[in-house]
Amino acid sequence: MDLDCQADIADLDTTLTTVERVLDVDGLRARIKTLEEAAADPNLWDDQARGQQVTSQLSHAQGELRRVEELRSRLDDLPVLYELAEESEDNSVVAEADAERVKLREDIEAMEVRTLLSGEYDEREAVVTIRSGAGGVDAADWAEMLMRMYIRWAEAHKYPVEVFDTSYAEEAGIKSATFAVHAPFAYGTLSVEQGTHRLVRISPFDNQSRRQTSFADVEVLPVVETTDHIDIPEGDLRVDVYRSSGPGGQSVNTTDSAVRLTHIPTGIVVTCQNEKSQLQNKVAAMRVLQARLLERKRQEERAEMDALKGDGGSSWGTQMRSYVLQPYQMVKDLRTEYEVGNPAAVLDGDIDGFIEAGIRWRNRRDD
């Protein structure tokens, strides 16, 4: 094994050791034991929310421990693989060792990104809202494509998704949609996706096949917990009920099960129609409303800090990524410069590279 390989392996060991220290592997094992005991409690599922929280946290903790242990095992095996390559004098074995070293660096660096999620709410689950912007029916179709992209990403990671509300456009696509991603660190991970996403393509809705630019906004909020003390007095809330509707305005329910909540002091409106009962829809809508009120509170606090620092801050809704399907194919993040020439894979949920680059960019900016 040459000196460059030795230096690279030593560098990987330093990075992985830092990851293990930040994740507190011994503490992680203790946490798994505690969660396993809680999961074994026969009364756990008397409280559905608590049961889901414990099982989700346990699955995530076990996954993190498994990943970091696998990385350590692979790194320990790497020098042995190079020794076998030297003894065999077989170029294919050397190539195998080199390929494993490159892949191992990618995997360790991806795990390192997880340690950068140290914000106050980063550990939370996420509430994601997608809204179509300028571009008419193309924008509505684009919003639905983005929704599918994020749901496919969550499914690839085995994160449960709960759709609260989908407002369908008349011709195609959606006006807006709100859904939750139930996974620890979902908020910290997806928060870098917030902003305006731009699509350039030949419009499938234009009979002259002209190129169309469409926009959609992505909003990512942390799920509210009881410790956030987001209390909503009954007098501040207006509750309206109506029948759920599907694509083209078709009624999908014969009862008034859909719920619209209006927070009177702020004018924030939340709707939910995807659950089967009015009560379930109201509970889901309240969760989204609380998340939006928490975000409003955070924005006010950030504005105060920016005023003290003389910093204008970054505004929500700024264009952050461009997806070009025609005349060439490219997806490029305008903040990080990270780009991929395979839009089909990205729109099918392969966005980890963009997320990792976004988290690193955010940490450098905040430093």
UniProtKB/Swiss-Prot annotation:
A GO cellular component annotation in the UniProt record: cytoplasm
Predominant localisation class: cytoplasm
Keyword Cytoplasm: yes
Keyword annotations from UniProtKB, A to Z: Cytoplasm, Methylation, Protein biosynthesis
Mod. after translation: Methylated by PrmC. Methylation increases the termination efficiency of RF2.
Residues making up the signal peptide according to the UniProt record: none
Annotated InterPro entries: PCRF, Pep_chain_release_fac_I, Pep_chain_release_fac_I_sf, PrfB
Molecular function GO terms recorded: translation release factor activity, codon specific
SMART domains in alphabetical order: PCRF (SM00937)
Modified residues (N5-methylglutamine): 250
Cellular localization per UniProt: Cytoplasm
NCBIfam families: prfB (TIGR00020)
PANTHER family: CLASS I PEPTIDE CHAIN RELEASE FACTOR, PEPTIDE CHAIN RELEASE FACTOR 2
Family: Belongs to the prokaryotic/mitochondrial release factor family.
Described function: Peptide chain release factor 2 directs the termination of translation in response to the peptide chain termination codons UGA and UAA.
Protein name listed in UniProt: Peptide chain release factor 2
UniProt organism field: Mycobacteroides abscessus (strain ATCC 19977 / DSM 44196 / CCUG 20993 / CIP 104536 / JCM 13569 / NCTC 13031 / TMC 1543 / L948)
